[in-house]
Amino acid sequence: MPYAIDLFCGAGGMSEGITQAGFHILFSSDINADVEKTYVNRHEQLGLIQNVNTYFHRGDIREIDGKFILEKIKNLKMFISGERKVPDDIDAIFGGPPCQGFSRAGKRDPNDPRNLLFKEYLRVINQIRPKYVIMENVEGFNDTKFYGYIGVTGKEYDDESLAPVILRNEFSLIGYNTLEPKVLLASDYGVPQNRKRAIFIAYREGEKVPRYPEPMFNEDNKITVLEAIGDLIKDENIRNKVNPQLTQYQKDSINGRTPTINGGVVRNDNQLLQNIETSNHLPIIKERFSLYRDGEDSAALRKRIEKEGIDISLKPHLIKECCEKLNMEKDEVLNILKNGNINKEIIDVLLTKKNIRTRLSKDKCSLTVVTLPDDYISPFEDRTFSVREMARLQSFDDNFVFLGKRTTGGPRRKLEVPQYSQVGNAVPPLLARAVAKEIYLVIEETE
């Protein structure tokens, strides 16, 4: 079984895929205490026990080096006892330096310290010198420019040098060849989500050339939201109607895809599905959600109401809100909304100015799963999604339990990583598996 290191591991999406592909993770690291609880708990489920056959380090990558990592690996009980031989080489290092600094959404700051964490990743790689390196990031990483960047060997780069150009050059300077960076679409690999990730693969000089995975699904057979989470609908009548029997994806999620260290399945002794709590929305919020059609976002809803009008006669809480804020009688409000040609003031009261949401389409792949629960409405019920539903859309097994606070807000968001963020920040396990499997195969061919 090839050995891997998982850096910037988060709650463990990449780790799931690495393990499913056949690797044994010897060392993993992340800076956050919330994700540590989730990650270590999951590894214990899989039979990966701290200091015995794996080691998780919570800390800043800027404060550790290759010597520290290799020492922790060498001192694992399975190596000290002689049960297994300490490897001469680490087969692969996987990692995704935090992506906020590379995001296309919002203003980019060239001085954002998160943009330089991939330099620390390179430093550790140069010190450990694994056979293969896999780095993942947001799609925007490929057109990120750096200013005043100095590489791990001291080379200075011109301002506005592109990140992939720097990476390829840096790897070359430390004795690694690279594949052309590639953006992969998660739904091509069995994830019910149109999430794009930039993947960068490097291999040590002299090692067999790896390749990117070929798409496994096409537009005709990609997993839809209904096929992924239809069995998690809370209303039994709706569930029985739209999801009368389990789909293969649902069965795989329930039974689990990630094997234990011995090749077995994770036992779920209490049989209770975790992370299924949903928000207790106020009646007026539910009525507002009910205005959205399948696959419709706030902008499209506004345009539809402006053009066609809308009937809210069966929505008493919205009627009351409009009457009070617009200082109108009920019949006047209903008539104005029904007839179309409605002004912005009325729509702002009906929907609220900050209402930016989308009701996912049940018959399509999900949009990119995000870290906030409020952005998406269920296609089946007038509510937002549970952590478990979001995890399903990311391709996590149902027996993968997310620990810590369910959600958080305000200044705490800078320090805490609640369950929704753990899910939204993760690499989809099935995408990670597809990439890791290609690395596994070239290692097996060599050996």
How should each PLM-predicted stretch be described?
Residues G17-F23, R42:
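A short, Lys/Arg-enriched amphipathic alpha-helix followed by its capping loop at the start of a domain
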Residues M1-I5:
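Extreme N-terminal starter segment of soluble prokaryotic enzymes
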Residues G12, E16:
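Glycine-rich SAM-binding Motif I of class I
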Residues R257-E447:
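C-terminal target-recognition/interaction regions appended to catalytic cores
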Residues T38-S81:
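S-adenosyl-L-methionine
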Residues D30-D34:
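Short beta->alpha hinge that forms the Motif I/post-I loop of the SAM-binding pocket
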